[in-house]
């Protein structure tokens, strides 16, 4: 019950590219992003960092590194345009350069999560942060 309350708090007031990211993840994996990846492993979700537990968690680690390279906008809050065409994510051509980067980061993690669905391990779905070992920097 406490976990559901925490997830609800995390979702309040969320807009911008996080919502777009969650939509991309659902489109690519068929999984609800917040529920399945919000606290997955050591790297999926806000404020989580550590040595990846598996390939799924590695997708999130690489995504965080991708966001660190973005300058000029807020990757978690600023909205961008994209479309879903023929079961593929297409980042909008009219996005400013910074938001093109954010969209490409989000697209890459969504595809990575789909490609690694076979490594998804339910024991890491709500993984305790204290069990995460320090990871290398990006």
UniProtKB/Swiss-Prot annotation:
Keyword Cytoplasm: no
EC number: 3.1.1.4
Cofactor: how and how many bound: Binds 1 Ca(2+) ion.
InterPro entries membership: PLipase_A2, PLipase_A2_Asp_AS, PLipase_A2_dom, PLipase_A2_dom_sf, PLipase_A2_His_AS
Active site: 63, 106
Keywords, comma-separated and alphabetical: Blood coagulation cascade inhibiting toxin, Disulfide bond, Hemostasis impairing toxin, Hydrolase, Metal-binding, Myotoxin, Secreted, Signal, Toxin
Entry binding sites for Ca(2+): 45, 47
Top-level taxon: Eukaryota
GO cellular component, one term: extracellular region
Subcellular location: Secreted
Keyword Isomerase set for record: no
Annotated signal peptide: 1-16
Tissue: Expressed by the venom gland.
Biological processes, Gene Ontology terms: arachidonate secretion; lipid catabolic process; negative regulation of T cell proliferation; phospholipid metabolic process
Disulphide-bonded residues: 42-132, 44-60, 59-112, 65-138, 66-105, 73-98, 91-103
EC class (word): hydrolase
GO MF, one annotated term: phospholipid binding
Cofactor(s), names only, from the UniProt record: Ca(2+)
Function: Snake venom phospholipase A2 (PLA2) that has low phospholipase A2 activity. Shows anticoagulant activities, strong myolytic activity, infiltration of polymorphonuclear cells, and edema in stromal tissues. Induces cell death of Jurkat cells in a concentration dependent manner. PLA2 catalyzes the calcium-dependent hydrolysis of the 2-acyl groups in 3-sn-phosphoglycerides.
Misc. remarks from the entry: Is expressed in Amami-Oshima P.flavoviridis venom, but is missing in Tokunoshima P.flavoviridis venom.
UniProt record similarity statement: Belongs to the phospholipase A2 family. Group II subfamily. K49 sub-subfamily.
Protein name, per record: Basic phospholipase A2 BP-III
Organism of this sequence: Protobothrops flavoviridis
């Amino acid at each position: 019950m406490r976990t559901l309350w925490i997830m609800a708090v995390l979702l309040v007031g969320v807009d911008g590219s996080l919502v777009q990211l969650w939509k991309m993840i659902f489109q690519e994996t068929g999984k609800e992003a917040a529920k399945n990846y919000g606290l997955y492993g050591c790297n999926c979700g806000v404020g989580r960092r550590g040595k990846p537990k598996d390939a799924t968690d590695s997708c999130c680690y690489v995504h965080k590194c991708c966001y660190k390279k973005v300058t000029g906008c807020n990757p978690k809050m600023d909205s961008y345009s994209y479309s879903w065409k023929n079961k593929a994510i297409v980042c909008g051509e009219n996005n400013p350069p910074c938001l093109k980067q954010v969209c490409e980061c989000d697209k890459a993690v969504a595809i990575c999560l789909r490609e690694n669905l076979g490594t998804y391990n339910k024991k890491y779905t709500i993984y305790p942060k204290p069990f995460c070992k320090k990871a290398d920097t990006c």
